[in-house]
Design a protein with these regions (language model features):
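Glycine-rich phosphate/pyrophosphate-handling loop used in enzymes and phosphotransfer proteins
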Residues: 1-246
Length: 246
């Protein structure tokens, strides 16, 4: 046995031991607290999926035509920065999607984002052809990110990118300017609030890109983000969201 190989054996054993401990630890947690569907509490076979198959099957696909109309209704043609829009599910005020969004946003469960992103990616793989060169999450301003501890759209984007087999590039888009919450603003005020909030960190050389956000309401945030990417030279910019608000 060579010197190098001999010296790497203990390191491998330690790493293997840590992996085993993690595996056993997770297994033990699953026995003590069996993973359950966020919405109906059914037991789940895979701890990393937030919802059971029946709850996922019960979600209603969002009509992309309605999303397109919302983008067209944005002030001064700003919605045209988005080449095509793909909202996955229609928002259900009392249903499974609400439970998932709530867990993602307010209950500090970022790992669900990646799993939900894979669901988005699976639907996109059927409709978005050819695939984009990279997936870019809509960023949070750093103050908001500090409050929440993570950006839920970045978690979704990672799952989408994984499923599409393309890189995820959270660093390509920045949000240097803080904005007010969009919740109680009119369509016009929402656009004014986010217009100019984003900037791209580098030249994007005609690359087709997919923006990922958690929810589409008027589309103003996605359009402002897409505009910043287009200003930096991106090719067509697509927008995918987990949910479409009423
Ligand atoms: Zn369920």
């Amino acid at each position: 046995m060579s010197q190098a190989l001999a010296s790497s054996v203990p390191g491998r054993l330690v790493r293997g031991g840590r992996r085993l401990a993690r595996h056993v630890g997770r297994g033990l947690l699953d026995v003590l607290y069996p993973p359950r569907c966020l919405a109906c509490q059914a037991r789940l076979s895979r701890a990393r999926a937030p919802l059971c198959a029946a709850c996922v099957a019960g979600l209603e696909r969002a009509p992309s035509e309605v999303a397109r109309q919302r983008l067209h209704a944005l002030p001064s043609g700003s919605g045209t920065a988005i080449a095509a829009v793909f909202p996955l599910w229609r928002f259900d005020p009392d249903g499974a999607l609400r439970a998932l969004q709530h867990a993602l946003k307010y209950q500090n469960r970022p790992r669900y984002g990646r799993a939900a992103g894979r669901w988005m990616g699976r639907a996109l793989a059927e409709t978005l052809s050819p695939p984009p060169e990279a997936v870019v999450p809509v960023p949070l301003h750093r103050t908001r990110k500090l409050e929440r501890g993570y950006n839920q759209s970045a978690r979704l984007a990672r799952g989408v990118a994984e499923r599409l087999g393309v890189p995820c590039r959270p660093g390509w888009l920045e949000r240097p300017h803080p904005t007010r919450s969009q919740t109680h603003l009119s369509r016009q005020a929402r656009w004014e609030n986010v217009d100019g909030a984003f900037s791209a960190s580098q030249s994007l050389d005609g690359r087709p890109l997919l923006l990922v956000d958690d929810v589409l309401t008027t589309g103003a945030t996605g359009a402002a983000a897409a505009r910043a990417l287009r200003h930096a030279g991106a090719g067509p910019v697509y927008l995918a969201t987990l949910a479409m608000a009423e």
